[in-house]
Design a protein with these regions (language model features):
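Catalytic adenosine-cofactor/nucleotide-binding cores of aminoacyl-tRNA synthetases and other
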Residues: 1-45, 146-151, 192-201
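A structural signal for long alpha-helical coiled-coils and helix-turn connectors
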Residues: 33, 66-70
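Conserved phosphate-binding loops in nucleotide/dinucleotide-binding enzymes
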Residues: 4-20, 71, 75-76, 166-177
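Core structural elements
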Residues: 1-2, 20-33, 49-61, 79-100, ...
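Acidic, turn-prone loop/beta-hairpin segments
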Residues: 38-66, 94-184, 199
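Long hydrophobic segments that form regular secondary structure
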Residues: 59, 73, 81, 185-190, ...
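Conserved, well-structured core segments
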Residues: 82-85, 178-181, 187, 203
Length: 203
């Protein structure tokens, strides 16, 4: 955040980094739209711990972004939105969702629940990001919004997200954090022994 009489050096590396962020968000939206094309119909839903985890983490991200705006710390607002989008939604939740959507053992209720959380989380994330990157979020939202049940003509006509304390789930966060630690540990062991990702190993 630049103040008066303070100059910031233009950093092309940061520009490239945010270009990569835009690409990451675009690809995430494509994955969500492709994964939710097949309608599971109305009915009961079952949420996995990972579905509950991302809903819980989204509330924390919303609170952090809103606090950044309230304090006129637009840098902190952008950082909170960036970190949730990249490190939690894209890097982890999208991968977790594949274990439900691509498994023959998953029930219709499980797939229905994961698909709904995918769409609702992305739609909320787009509204959260909109003040920071209005054009791209509007473009994606025009396709995602209707699937999430939104009827406004523009993302600008929809309310800005507010954190919902009822969706904070400490148990899901604890379980998912342990799962992430195990996965990272296995990846580290693979790297230490030069085991290719394609090689299946007993755990």
């Amino acid at each position: 955040l630049a103040t008066q009489s303070r100059d910031l050096r233009f950093d092309l590396g940061r520009v490239e980094g945010y270009r990569n962020f835009c690409n990451k968000l675009w690809n995430a939206a494509r994955f969500v739209m492709m994964s939710t094309e097949q309608d599971e119909g109305a009915g009961e839903e079952t949420l996995s711990p990972y579905d509950r985890w991302i809903r819980s983490r989204l509330q924390a991200a919303i609170a952090a972004v809103r606090q950044g705006f309230a304090d006129y710390r637009f840098d902190l607002a952008a950082q909170a939105a960036y970190e949730f989008t990249w490190y939690e939604f894209c890097d982890w939740y999208l991968e977790f969702s594949k274990t439900v959507l691509q498994s023959e053992a998953s029930s219709t209720e499980q797939r229905r629940g994961t698909k709904r959380v995918l769409v609702e989380s992305l739609e909320t994330l787009l509204r959260l990001l909109h003040p920071l990157m209005p054009y791209m979020t509007e473009e994606i939202w025009q396709r995602v919004g209707p699937r999430a049940g939104r009827t406004a003509a523009s993302i600008m006509r929809e309310p800005y997200p507010t954190a919902d304390a009822s969706r904070v789930d400490a148990d899901a966060e604890s379980l998912t954090n342990r799962a992430r630690d195990v996965i990272l540990g296995i990846r580290g062991i693979r790297g230490s022994f030069d085991i290719a990702p394609s090689v299946r190993i007993p755990i």
